[in-house]
């Protein structure tokens, strides 16, 4: 089953000023992904992975490939440049078993993300908040973004 949703959280989660800067993805750009992959103990706090943008598809497709690890639970999580700008939102990884069955090899480092220009259309800001552009190390970027990341759990059941 594939699904997408815009989730409105009824509690006050602060917007990270850095995330209000959207940039277009460019092949070769460094990115980090923040999300809640896996099960059990990995749900206690978001994890961070890094990679690059490996391929940008045309604007009509609205997606790009990244080498940042995208696993179950990362879907809907942000991808940021190292200066804290939102470049996309992760949504899928290749089906490794299917790829193995069809191609005879296991793919690695191929996650999909939606381009930030499509996300920007959903989150139109009434006013622009000036943001000083600066490079961060991955640990400090993670700490700055952490208050704005929320875990959403969906329970599927009978109708």
Task: Indicate residue ranges for each PLM-predicted region.
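Conserved beta-strand residues within beta-sheet cores
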Residues: 30, 50, 67, 76, ...
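Short, well-ordered secondary-structure micro-motifs
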Residues: 43-46, 77, 100-101
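A residue-level detector for short acidic-glycine micro-motifs
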Residues: 55-56, 81
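Conserved active-site neighborhood of the chymotrypsin/trypsin-like protease fold
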Residues: 1-43, 60-64, 119-120, 125-135, ...
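C-terminal cap/linker of serine protease catalytic domains
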Residues: 13-16, 37-38, 86-159
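Extracytoplasmic
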Residues: 1-4, 26, 48-53, 59-63, ...
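Catalytic nucleophile loop of clan PA
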Residues: 69-90
């Amino acid at each position: 089953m594939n699904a997408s949703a815009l989730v409105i959280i009824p509690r006050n989660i602060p917007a990270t000023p850095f995330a209000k800067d959207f940039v277009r993805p460019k092949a070769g750009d460094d990115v980090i992904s923040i999300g809640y992959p896996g099960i059990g103990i990995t749900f206690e706090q978001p994890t961070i992975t890094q990679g690059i943008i490996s391929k940008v598809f045309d604007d009509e497709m609205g997606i790009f490939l990244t080498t940042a690890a995208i696993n179950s639970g990362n879907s809907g999580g942000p991808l940021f440049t190292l200066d804290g700008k939102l470049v996309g939102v992760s949504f899928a990884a290749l089906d490794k078993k299917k790829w193995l069955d069809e191609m005879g090899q296991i793919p690695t480092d191929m996650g999909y993300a939606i381009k930030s220009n499509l996300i920007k259309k959903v989150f139109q800001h009434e006013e622009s908040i000036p943001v000083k552009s600066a490079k961060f190390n991955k640990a400090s970027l993670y700490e700055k973004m952490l208050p704005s990341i929320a875990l959403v759990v969906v329970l599927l059941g009978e109708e």
